[in-house]
Amino acid sequence: MILADIYIPAVDANYDFMLDENVPTVQVMEEISEMISKKVKEKKPMQIMDFVLYSMDTGTLLDHNLSLYANGIHDGSRMIFV
C-alpha cells in the first residue's frame, strides 16, 4: 500500500489515498470515482474509461492496464484525476 495525493479538478480538491500499487490503474480509478461520487452526492460515472489519471511528478498519462507500480507511482506520488 502507498499513500498518494490525488487532485480532482472537477471538485477543486486534493485527497490523500491509501492505494494498492499492485492492482491495475483502472481499478484504482474506479475507487477514486466512487469516493468522489459519495463525497459530492452524485451518481458514479458509468464509463470510467472516459477518465484519465496523470502523474504530476512525471507529467505522464498512466496506462489503465498497468499497475500503479508499473506506471512509476510510489509512496508520496502526486496525481490528477480528470
What is each PLM-predicted segment?
Residues 1-82:
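Ubiquitin system architectures
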